[in-house]
Each structure stands twice: as C-alpha cells, then as structure tokens.
Design a protein with these regions (language model features):
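…primarily DNA-binding HTH/wHTH and HhH modules…
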Residues: 116-134
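Basic, amphipathic alpha-helical hairpins
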Residues: 17-24, 36-48, 68-72, 89-98, ...
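Short, Lys/Arg-enriched, Trp-marked, Pro/Gly-tolerant hinge/linker segments that flank
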Residues: 15-34, 57, 70-78, 82
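Single conserved hydrophobic/aromatic residue that forms the stacking wall/gate
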Residues: 1-14
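Append "Primarily bacterial transcriptional regulators
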Residues: 52-59, 64, 68, 102-109, ...
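Terminal helix-turn-helix DNA-binding modules in bacterial transcription factors
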Residues: 70-109, 131-134
Length: 134
C-alpha cells in the first residue's frame, strides 16, 4: 500500500481528460490502455472486477492480470482502488457532498470500508481530509 499511498498523495496525472494517475514510464500495450480507459469510465460501478474488465477488452483474466502488473507494477484492482480514492479526494475537496455520498459515487457500498481504505492510502479519514479542504 505504500506505493499506492505515495501515488495517491502525488495527484499527478497522465492525462487530465481521463484523470488517469501517473504510472511508470514506458509504452503501454493496448490492453493496459483499454483497462485504464475502462476504469476511468466505470470506477463508480461497485460491481466492477477483473472479470468484467477482461471481458470488456476481450482477453482472459490471467492475461490481463499479467500484462497490467508487468507494465504498471500495479494489479488492475489495486489501480482501481487507487483511482477511486483519487476521485474521492476530488469530490471531498469540493465540500458539496457528505462522506457517505462520496463513497457511493466512487463505487463503495460500505462506507466503513471506504473510510478505512481512504485512510490507509491518504493518512487521513475522509472527514478529516474534507475538513482540511474547507
């Protein structure tokens, strides 16, 4: 989680248009790029998993897992978590939404799990983070 935590904290993006977070340099295969695009478009879906991602781009779960990890140093689901927390930070900083609303907006059904994941990656609870943005 330390690697994810530092990446979430940096808030660097590859492309603002898609809000893709910074990844290790180097060319990415079409499967990795398609996975990043899929995550950017569907991160709010609480049912997203490696199976739905792999099916959407037409490859096996095993191949997707291998290629994504090799090219990014993250698992696809690890990146999904990272992306969700990145988007949650943006929503919490806006201050228009309550923590439970943000949790649902970024794909978490369980607010407590969202809170513990957020704190693990940012060092602050969602409400502490939001208070600092006011």
């Amino acid at each position: 989680y330390e690697m994810l935590r530092s990446l979430v904290g940096s808030e660097m993006c590859i492309r603002d248009r898609d809000d893709l977070l910074a990844l290790p340099k180097g060319d990415k295969s079409k499967y990795v790029l398609q996975t990043l695009e899929y995550i950017a478009a569907h991160y709010a879906d609480a049912d997203i998993n490696i199976t739905t991602i792999a099916r959407s781009i037409g490859i096996s779960e095993g191949h997707l897992s291998h290629v994504f990890k090799k090219e990014t140093s993250y698992t696809a689901l690890g990146y999904l978590t990272l992306y969700r927390i990145h988007m949650a930070r943006r929503l919490l900083a806006d201050c228009r939404y309550k923590v439970y609303e943000v949790a649902g907006m970024v794909g978490y059904r369980d607010v407590a799990y969202f809170g513990s994941t957020f704190k693990k990656l940012t060092g602050l609870s969602p409400s502490e983070y939001q208070d600092r943005c006011r």
